[in-house]
């Protein structure tokens, strides 16, 4: 049954755009057609998603007279590179795509990030649409206009803020999502409860098992509430000069894990979960949250099947990797920490010694 369960709006003035969340909406081209500037689109996807959903998306568009050019990339965080990005540019140039050709990113966070960055760069900007197919991308990375590729020295270090024209989140794509990917997506869902929505955190504690068994109504609620939180934050602080930085809870430590282990060894959500526990540990050591709160946070990640212990890269290696973090200001590392469950702050209050202690306490 094709249904749009909810539509949200990311309010950015002339660059505002809708988020359609529904079931079997990939085959509803009428949701996409109003956002196309010409009768040709490029669909950037990967080798895992293409066999599942590319034909469904293409057939609906082609029945409406829209020519589709697929660009199928290798799957994995390790391919979020200049080399893979250039494959997109090669395809765009070979097909003589124009500035008003629309690029559709069909896939998870890696495809959305790379497709969006390619769109931001090609002929100095072409329109693009996000069609996220993983829980993580539906609740987080597809909304807000962050696009990037990785660098050997740090994750998402080369990129741009570039907003999509539309986000189309089809909950049906979660049916084929591997369990590990579903669990990884829950890390970003839980994040919203921790940083700004304590009632949502309570709901997640009560409904986590429903999400793990892919209950459609529970997933629809979680995706909608996560996107509503993200849309509010992005509308207030598009370029991450203030409140938007709070969305990076667990990410400073998490990005260090991903870079230190090698891209693709841990999924992004897995690294964020372990990183969030380090941040919670540090918040506790600063006297901002109590040990019971840390235990409560750890419990929901354990129930989600996510790692709560970080890999032992060595505290010095963590600090080295974190020194490249995008929140560093005047050479000083700023971290997203918790004042309570449901309230986060960006702070440079932690000393190096306190960071080391927290890292060592949460490493295996």
UniProtKB/Swiss-Prot annotation:
<comment type="pathway">
    <text>Metabolic intermediate biosynthesis; chorismate biosynthesis; chorismate from D-erythrose 4-phosphate and phosphoenolpyruvate: step 2/7.</text>
</comment>
<dbReference type="InterPro" id="IPR030963">
    <property type="entry name" value="DHQ_synth_fam"/>
</dbReference>
<keyword id="KW-0520">NAD</keyword>
<keyword id="KW-0862">Zinc</keyword>
<feature type="binding site">
    <location>
        <position position="155"/>
    </location>
    <ligand>
        <name>NAD(+)</name>
    </ligand>
</feature>
<keyword id="KW-0479">Metal-binding</keyword>
<comment type="function">
    <text>Catalyzes the conversion of 3-deoxy-D-arabino-heptulosonate 7-phosphate (DAHP) to dehydroquinate (DHQ).</text>
</comment>
<dbReference type="InterPro" id="IPR030960">
    <property type="entry name" value="DHQS/DOIS_N"/>
</dbReference>
<dbReference type="GO" id="GO:0000166">
    <property type="term" value="F:nucleotide binding"/>
</dbReference>
<keyword id="KW-0547">Nucleotide-binding</keyword>
<dbReference type="Pfam" id="PF24621">
    <property type="entry name" value="DHQS_C"/>
</dbReference>
<dbReference type="GO" id="GO:0009073">
    <property type="term" value="P:aromatic amino acid family biosynthetic process"/>
</dbReference>
<keyword id="KW-0028">Amino-acid biosynthesis</keyword>
<feature type="binding site">
    <location>
        <position position="251"/>
    </location>
    <ligand>
        <name>Zn(2+)</name>
    </ligand>
</feature>
<dbReference type="InterPro" id="IPR050071">
    <property type="entry name" value="Dehydroquinate_synthase"/>
</dbReference>
<dbReference type="InterPro" id="IPR056179">
    <property type="entry name" value="DHQS_C"/>
</dbReference>
<keyword id="KW-0963">Cytoplasm</keyword>
<dbReference type="GO" id="GO:0005737">
    <property type="term" value="C:cytoplasm"/>
</dbReference>
<dbReference type="GO" id="GO:0046872">
    <property type="term" value="F:metal ion binding"/>
</dbReference>
<feature type="binding site">
    <location>
        <position position="268"/>
    </location>
    <ligand>
        <name>Zn(2+)</name>
    </ligand>
</feature>
<dbReference type="InterPro" id="IPR016037">
    <property type="entry name" value="DHQ_synth_AroB"/>
</dbReference>
<feature type="binding site">
    <location>
        <position position="146"/>
    </location>
    <ligand>
        <name>NAD(+)</name>
    </ligand>
</feature>
<dbReference type="GO" id="GO:0003856">
    <property type="term" value="F:3-dehydroquinate synthase activity"/>
</dbReference>
<keyword id="KW-0456">Lyase</keyword>
<keyword id="KW-0057">Aromatic amino acid biosynthesis</keyword>
<comment type="similarity">
    <text>Belongs to the sugar phosphate cyclases superfamily. Dehydroquinate synthase family.</text>
</comment>
<protein>
    <recommendedName>
        <fullName>3-dehydroquinate synthase</fullName>
        <ecNumber>4.2.3.4</ecNumber>
    </recommendedName>
</protein>
<feature type="binding site">
    <location>
        <begin position="133"/>
        <end position="134"/>
    </location>
    <ligand>
        <name>NAD(+)</name>
    </ligand>
</feature>
<feature type="binding site">
    <location>
        <position position="188"/>
    </location>
    <ligand>
        <name>Zn(2+)</name>
    </ligand>
</feature>
<dbReference type="GO" id="GO:0008652">
    <property type="term" value="P:amino acid biosynthetic process"/>
</dbReference>
<keyword id="KW-0170">Cobalt</keyword>
<feature type="binding site">
    <location>
        <begin position="173"/>
        <end position="176"/>
    </location>
    <ligand>
        <name>NAD(+)</name>
    </ligand>
</feature>
<feature type="binding site">
    <location>
        <begin position="109"/>
        <end position="113"/>
    </location>
    <ligand>
        <name>NAD(+)</name>
    </ligand>
</feature>
<feature type="binding site">
    <location>
        <begin position="75"/>
        <end position="80"/>
    </location>
    <ligand>
        <name>NAD(+)</name>
    </ligand>
</feature>
<dbReference type="GO" id="GO:0009423">
    <property type="term" value="P:chorismate biosynthetic process"/>
</dbReference>
<dbReference type="Pfam" id="PF01761">
    <property type="entry name" value="DHQ_synthase"/>
</dbReference>
């Amino acid at each position: 049954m094709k249904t749009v369960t909810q539509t949200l709006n990311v309010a950015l003035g002339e660059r505002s755009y809708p988020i359609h969340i529904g079931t079997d909406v990939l085959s509803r081209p009428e949701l996409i057609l109003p956002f196309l500037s010409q009768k040709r689109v490029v669909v950037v996807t990967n080798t895992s998603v293409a066999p599942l959903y590319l034909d469904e998306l293409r057939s609906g568009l082609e029945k409406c007279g829209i020519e589709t050019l697929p660009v199928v990339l290798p799957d994995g965080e390790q391919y979020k590179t200049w080399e893979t990005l250039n494959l997109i540019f090669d395809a765009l140039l070979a097909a003589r795509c124009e500035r008003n050709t629309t690029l559709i990113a069909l896939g998870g966070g890696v495809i959305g990030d790379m497709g969006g960055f390619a769109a931001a760069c090609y002929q100095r900007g072409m329109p693009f649409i996000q069609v996220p197919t993983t829980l993580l991308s539906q609740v987080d990375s597809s909304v807000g206009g962050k696009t990037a590729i990785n660098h050997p020295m740090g994750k998402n270090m080369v990129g741009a803020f570039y907003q999509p024209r539309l986000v189309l989140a089809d909950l049906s794509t979660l049916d084929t999502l591997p369990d590990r990917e579903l669990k990884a997506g829950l890390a970003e869902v839980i994040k919203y409860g921790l940083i700004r929505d304590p009632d949502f955190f309570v709901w997640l504690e009560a409904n986590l098992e429903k999400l793990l068994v892919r209950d459609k109504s529970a997933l629809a609620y979680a995706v909608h509430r996560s996107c509503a939180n993200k849309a509010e934050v992005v509308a207030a602080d598009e370029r991450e000069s203030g409140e938007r930085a709070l969305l990076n809870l667990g990410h400073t430590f998490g990005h260090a894990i991903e870079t230190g282990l090698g891209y693709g060894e841990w999924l992004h959500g897995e690294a964020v979960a372990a990183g969030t526990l380090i941040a919670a540990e540090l918040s506790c050591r600063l006297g901002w949250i109590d040990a019971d709160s840390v235990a409560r946070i750890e419990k929901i990640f354990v129930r989600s099947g996510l790692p709560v212990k970080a890999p032992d890269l060595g505290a010095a290696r963590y600090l080295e990797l974190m020194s490249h973090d995008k929140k560093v200001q005047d050479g000083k590392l700023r971290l997203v920490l918790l004042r309570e469950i449901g309230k986060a702050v960006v702070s440079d209050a932690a000393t190096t010694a306190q960071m080391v202690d927290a890292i060592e306490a949460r490493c295996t």
